[in-house]
From Swiss-Prot:
It comes from Brevibacterium linens. It comes from the Bacteria. This is Isopentenyl-diphosphate Delta-isomerase. Mn(2+) binds at residues 23, 30, 67, 112, 114. Pathway: Isoprenoid biosynthesis; dimethylallyl diphosphate biosynthesis; dimethylallyl diphosphate from isopentenyl diphosphate: step 1/1. One of its GO terms (molecular function) is isopentenyl-diphosphate delta-isomerase activity. Binds 1 Mg(2+) ion per subunit. The magnesium ion binds only when substrate is bound. Binds 1 Mn(2+) ion per subunit. InterPro entries: Idi_bact, IsopentenylPP_isomerase_typ1, NUDIX_hydrolase-like_dom_sf, NUDIX_hydrolase_dom. Its EC number is 5.3.3.2. Its cofactor is Mg(2+); Mn(2+).
Length: 182
């Protein structure tokens, strides 16, 4: 059974609960993460959530999201989910927005209530999306993504809409840092 870490409003752990039980009409705050993957050309990977996903099925979002297991570091969880959702190896995993949190309710009434640090990572392998997680994947520029979010925010996950303006200038910095490390 997959477990998630419950957190207080500061993001500090206060317990655990099964993932299956945590998401509902009144979801307790729990730890999650979002990750944006960039390629060697500086493009961002956006994905459309699989239609069978329990929350926000079919919406476009960042590259992937997930929940760290109890005792798992966020960086290890990011690597694990990149492989699981996208069949992708990543490096240069950087926490760009450590204190991002949001609460949102999808059309089915399920509430998300997440302390959700936002990461940027670099793709180092080819993409093989898991169809149970990802309906579509597309590489795009950050400016094209920002324009699309501004034009049709309803087509994107609420967490992406909420954090992307803060994240956008950090993407270019991450690309330069990754290149400098090589």
């Amino acid at each position: 059974m997959e477990m998630v870490v419950l957190v207080d409003h500061a993001g500090d752990p206060i317990g655990v609960q099964s993932k299956a039980d945590v998401h509902g009409q009144s979801t307790p705050r729990h730890l999650a993460f979002s990750c944006h993957v960039v390629d060697e050309q500086g493009r961002l990977l956006v994905t459309r959530r699989a239609l069978k996903k329990r929350t926000w099925p079919g919406v476009w979002t960042n590259s992937f999201c997930g929940h760290p297991a109890p005792g798992e570091t966020l960086e290890d969880a990011v690597s694990r989910r990149a492989e699981f959702e996208l069949g992708l190896s990543i490096d240069h995993i950087t926490c760009a927005i450590p204190n991002f949190s949001y609460v949102a309710r999808d059309a089915s009434g399920i509430e998300e209530n997440e302390h959700c640090p936002v990461f940027i990572a670099r793709a180092v392998s080819s993409l093989t999306p898991n169809p149970a997680e990802v309906a579509e994947a597309q590489w795009t520029s950050s400016s094209e993504l920002k324009s699309a979010i501004d034009a049709a925010p309803w087509a994107f996950s609420p967490w992406l809409v909420e954090h992307f303006t803060e994240l956008q200038p950090l993407i270019a910095e991450h690309i330069v840092e990754a290149e400098d490390d090589d």
